[in-house]
Amino acid sequence: MVNDSLYSKELVCPACKSKIEVTKVKSKACVISSKDTDFCVYYEGINPILYEAWVCEYCGYAALGERFEELTDKQAQKIKTGISPYWKSRSFNGERNIDLALEAYKLALYNLHVLEAKSSDLAKVCIRIAWLYRINDKDSGSKDKENEFLNYALQHYVKAYESERFPIGKFDEITCTYIIGELYRRIGNPEESLKWFSKI
């Protein structure tokens, strides 16, 4: 691996049982420079968010690294029937640019839809896709795409707030209420934003 901030991890894909490698960022290479109000983090050097979506090159299974190995046999069967038959083998290992990271995240999002995942899981991937478009501000169409995925994330966070038990991932009720208010603010709906912020 060319970039010494990266390293490879070997594991077994929980969907197809193939031995695969995924790329991770060394923790010492992650130096935070700033944070946005919706928890988007900026780094001085390499950005670990580019590597958080892992992909099996053999079957097309993709998920956030923290959840990648949490796949039941029933879910694995859904991957085999809903994704693998249409998958063209390709590797996402090694150094990634934003375009490749976006592709990995969108594949993870598609996997979640096939698995009929919880709203909170969908929200987590959607907001990260929005952040990647924000980081990629050199692309003239990125702002529209950012807002599109912020809106998707918002819809899923609201559904999660209404239907899931707290904590939702790492979010307690106050944090979830805050992120909903903040996302409403970012997409230009101050009335709804204030309504949610007033609950805190």
Predicted regions and their residues:
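Structural motif corresponding to the intra-repeat A-B loop/turn of tetratricopeptide repeats
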Residues: N136, S140-K143, N147, I187
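N-terminal cysteine/histidine-rich coordination modules
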Residues: M1-T81
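Flexible helix-coil transition and linker loops at the boundaries of alpha-helical arrays
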Residues: N93-G94, A108-K124, D139, V158-K170
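TPR/TPR-like (Sel1-like) alpha-helical repeat modules
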Residues: L154, V158, P190-I200
